[in-house]
Regions:
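Short acidic/glycine- and proline-prone juxtamembrane loop motifs at membrane-interface regions
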Residues: 99-107
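Hydrophobic/aromatic-rich transmembrane helices and adjacent perimembrane loops
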Residues: 241-270, 274
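Specific aromatic-rich, kink-prone transmembrane helix
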Residues: 109-127
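Short periplasmic/luminal acceptor-recognition loop of GT-C membrane glycosyltransferases, typified by
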Residues: 296-369
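Transmembrane-helix motifs of polytopic, lipid-linked glycan transferases
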Residues: 57-77
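Membrane-interface alpha helices of multi-pass inner-membrane proteins
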Residues: 126-143, 148-152, 233-234
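Short helix- or helix-capping micro-motifs
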Residues: 87-92
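Signature aromatic-anchored transmembrane alpha helix within multi-pass, membrane-resident enzymes
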Residues: 266-295
Length: 381
């Protein structure tokens, strides 16, 4: 029964994503740049057919497994059952965790892999080394994990782990031809804005505070993984625009350390001096819930620059089918792939012109426009 609320929450996310979200441009990019994800989706399509259920299930199931593993990590780090349960719920409700679970992207898989390694390292040390070897071939972003292990092994004075991590880092960097590129240009504020969205503003501020405060406590593997990923992304942002899904997934596990920092400050004080921390918890948790709610109602907001493509393609396909248009050519390859997913095949009889700047779609037949649709209005159907 302890996992029942988690099951209910992820069932809600599954039904929500199938009902309201469309296969999007962002997800097309994610699939094309992460072969591992493409293979998973092919397997899901073979099992469930080519539909939204098959599209959303793998990410959401992986998200659910990540929460379960996090719960087991929390059991190793916290003392009471109440602390463990609340910490797990906080992790589950982090906006970045929700977003990565409902959207087809690599983030949720990286969260799962990092948490699986952390738990394995604590409980099944030899198995964790096997995981590290396998991770070399998964994605280039795992270089952050290997770099964190180098720092951790130096801190623990573990020569064998240091050499092992250096070798795996070299293999990973070589296999994916890891490069630092781009002209020097500051994306520092953009990065911070993204982290604000991932954690929620107040939680992210506390994340920074906990990173600092954890320096004075005994540092564990979670601290090194989260701190390394965060500071590497920070340093690189001064030079180039980074892909946040290469770094942010490794920071979410730090939630358990954030709670530990909070509890240590709370418990050392007498009951009459704990009022500030009770208020702080209410403020942090309320801000988290409010941002979560805004995510689900995002479809109905006037400006959707970040998320507009998650809503209109499915509705567009339905409109085309009502107009008895089942095949067409399209000036946008990504939109063409999405429409094909929803049953609109490629053909020459009709032509679709998509204008991102004007938020419009125009349908032509024999060089004559027969239908024009405002994409922004499709978002609120």
């Amino acid at each position: 029964m302890k996992f029942l609320p988690i099951i209910i929450f992820y069932l809600f996310l599954f039904l929500y994503s199938v009902e309201f979200l469309s296969f999007s441009f962002v997800e097309i990019d994610s699939i094309n740049h992460f072969p591992f994800l493409k293979n998973i989706l092919h397997l899901s399509s073979d099992l469930f057919g080519k539909n939204d259920y098959a599209l959303r299930f793998p990410s959401l199931f992986t998200g659910f497994l990540s929460v379960v593993i996090f719960y087991n990590i929390a059991k190793l780090k916290l003392k009471t059952k109440r602390e463990i349960i609340y910490t797990t719920y906080i992790f589950m409700l982090i906006p970045g965790m929700i977003i990565s679970s409902v959207i087809v992207n690599k983030s949720v898989y990286l969260i799962f892999l990092s948490l699986l390694f952390i738990y394995s390292y604590e409980k099944f040390r030899n198995f964790s080394y096997i995981l590290l070897i396998l991770y070399v071939f998964v994605d280039k972003s795992l270089i952050s994990l290997y770099l964190a292990l180098i720092f951790y092994s130096i801190y623990k004075r573990d020569t064998k782990l240091l050499i092992f991590s250096l070798i795996l880092l070299a293999f990973n960097a070589n296999y994916f031809e890891y490069k630092i590129h781009g002209r020097p240009k500051g994306y520092f504020l953009d990065l911070f804005g993204t982290y604000f969205l991932i954690f929620s503003p107040f939680i992210f501020v506390y994340f920074l505070y906990a990173l600092y405060k954890n320096i004075f406590y005994k540092k564990d593997l979670i601290y090194f993984i989260s701190a390394t990923a965060f500071f590497v992304s920070l340093i690189l942002s001064f030079r180039q625009k980074i892909k946040i899904d290469d770094y942010a997934p490794y920071t979410l596990g730090f939630v358990v350390n954030m709670v530990n920092v909070f509890l240590k400050s709370y418990k050392v004080r007498l009951p009459r001096f704990r009022t500030f921390y009770k208020i702080l918890f209410v403020v942090l948790f309320t801000s988290l819930i409010m941002l979560d709610i805004s995510l689900f109602f995002n479809k109905y907001t006037p400006a959707k620059k970040l998320s507009y493509s998650f809503y209109f393609p499915k509705n567009l396909a339905e409109i085309l089918k009502k107009e008895k248009i089942y095949s067409m050519s399209c000036n946008n390859e990504k939109l063409s792939e999405i429409l094909e997913f929803y049953g609109i095949k490629k053909g020459d009889k009709y032509k679709l012109i998509y204008s991102k700047n004007k938020n419009s779609v125009s349908i032509f037949h024999k060089n004559k426009i027969i239908l024009k649709i405002n994409v922004s209005k499709l978002n609120t159907i």
